[in-house]
């Protein structure tokens, strides 16, 4: 649910944000990210349930992933998906660790630690920080839009 003033004029940016989940348990923080990026004017696209447990689910979506200007990638447990995605695409990737999993991974600590230790170029927000991930993606989308508009 998003509340706005009647006079609010939402921007329509020439930039897209892909919001990716490893599994269904990542849906809530990913949903927050998608809503915030969308409210900031970016076109958004949800790509759900493409975790590393079955890599073909991810590789089947590579063209779709590569079509976006920025990606928010949510994952719990060991948090591997954002690292893998960042190695496969040539756009900014924002890792969104999620507090799912068992044992040490159950509070999102393992996912956060794994993303912070990534050898790929990856930015990371705090555990379950969908709002923050969406806002960061929206800011990147704004800059991409401004660059494209200036080039026209």
What are the residue ranges of the model-derived segments?
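Anion-binding alpha/beta catalytic cores of soluble intermediary-metabolism enzymes, centered on
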Residues: 1-12
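Glycine-rich oxoanion-binding loops at beta->alpha junctions
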Residues: 2, 43-64, 108-110, 125-126
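Glycine-rich phosphate/diphosphate-binding loop of Rossmann-like nucleotide-binding domains
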Residues: 12-57
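Short glycine-rich or small-residue beta-strand-to-loop segments that form or flank ligand, phosphate
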Residues: 16-23, 71-73, 124-126
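Short glycine/serine/threonine-rich phosphate/pyrophosphate-binding segments
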Residues: 26-31, 55-56, 75-85, 105, ...
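Glycine-rich phosphate-binding loop
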Residues: 60-98
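C-terminal binding/interaction regions
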Residues: 63-66, 70, 100, 104-152
